[in-house]
């Protein structure tokens, strides 16, 4: 009987420590994302180019969301070519050291595009650490 009680007691005492560690990591990630969103939103809205307006960042759980508005013509192109949009965004995200560091800590980056003035949804894309993993050639 004692053989069963000791391991069970140990598990009961250790389990909350693991939960606290996870909660601490989640709290630290959330705090970091809030800081990044606040700093990255300074000066918004701002034009990225003649077709894209950066409206700023928000945080939802582990997601850092970049809100972007695009002109109607750009919106049509993006809707017609979602794979090209994902490829271009992915290339940008995966080559950004700061974004990669956030993703290795569990963050998910989301780009949310809407049409300028109407706010009609255009496209949303999310990226996590596994999206930037180096693909090894097959043997």
What do the PLM-derived regions correspond to, one by one?
Residues 126-139:
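Short, low-complexity, Pro/Ser/Thr/Gly-rich segments in the mature regions of secreted, periplasmic
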Residues 68-72, 113-117, 127:
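A mature extracytoplasmic/lumenal domain signature
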Residues 47-71:
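Short edge beta-strands and adjacent turn/loop segments
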Residues 4-14:
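Sec-dependent N-terminal signal peptides
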Residues 17-23:
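Sec/Tat signal peptide C-region and signal peptidase I cleavage site
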């Amino acid at each position: 009987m004692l053989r069963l009680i000791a391991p069970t007691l140990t598990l009961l005492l250790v389990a909350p420590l693991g939960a606290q560690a996870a909660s601490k990591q989640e709290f630290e990630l959330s705090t970091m994302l809030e800081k990044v969103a606040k700093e990255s939103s300074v000066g918004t809205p701002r034009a990225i180019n003649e077709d894209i307006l950066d409206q700023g960042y928000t945080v939802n759980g582990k997601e850092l969301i970049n809100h972007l508005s695009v002109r109607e013509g750009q919106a049509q192109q993006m809707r017609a070519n979602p794979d090209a949009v994902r490829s271009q965004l992915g290339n940008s995200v995966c080559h950004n050291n700061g974004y990669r560091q956030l993703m290795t800590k569990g963050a998910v980056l989301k780009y949310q595009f809407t049409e300028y003035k109407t706010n009609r949804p255009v496209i949303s894309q999310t990226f996590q650490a596994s999206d930037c993993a180096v693909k090894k050639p097959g043997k």
